[in-house]
Amino acid sequence: MKKWIGLLTLVLLMTAATLSAHHGSAISYDTAHLWTTWATVTQFNYLNPHPSMKFDRTLKDGTVEHWDSELLTNPSALARAGWTKSRSIEALKPGTRVKLYVGTSRVGGFSGIVMKIENEQGENVVGERSNVMGVDKEGVAGGLQPGPEDRKEPNQ
């Protein structure tokens, strides 16, 4: 009996640590200062607890940045908003050009949390955050993401 109680305690502690670590997007990402960018989807995964997406962003000088991101919303909320797995995967297939509203990772690098996605027609593609606004470094609504000189490198 003591063995089972110990095992149950261990499982509960591990689960609690995972849950508290997971629900920290404001700690992990700068969601107060969102930026926008046009990007090309390279991979989209409709996963729990949050879908993930890889995208390429081309700078004005032609340099391509390869980004990893997760969506703020979860598959259950996406489905309730009409974005089923098949519809989301079709809308975000590799090669699709989208406008993203992103909160950059607080540790630097090319990772972030996507708060909103629009297609080339300006329609909200995935998610329920239609009121999200992004700015560029000059403070222009709907602007572009700050350049590499404005981001710190990971672990600095």
Residues covered by each model-derived region:
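Short nucleic-acid-contacting surface segments enriched for D/E, G, S/T with interspersed K/R
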Residues: 80-99
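Conserved hydrophobic positions within beta-strands
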Residues: 37-41
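Positively charged n-region of N-terminal signal peptides that target proteins for export
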Residues: 1-4
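Extended, charge-rich, solvent-exposed interface segments
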Residues: 123-156
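Bacterial N-terminal signal peptides
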Residues: 6-18
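Short aromatic-glycine-enriched beta-strand elements
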Residues: 47-57
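OB-fold/S1-family single-stranded nucleic acid-binding modules
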Residues: 103-132
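Short boundary/loop segments of OB/S1/cold-shock single-stranded nucleic-acid-binding domains
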Residues: 21-35
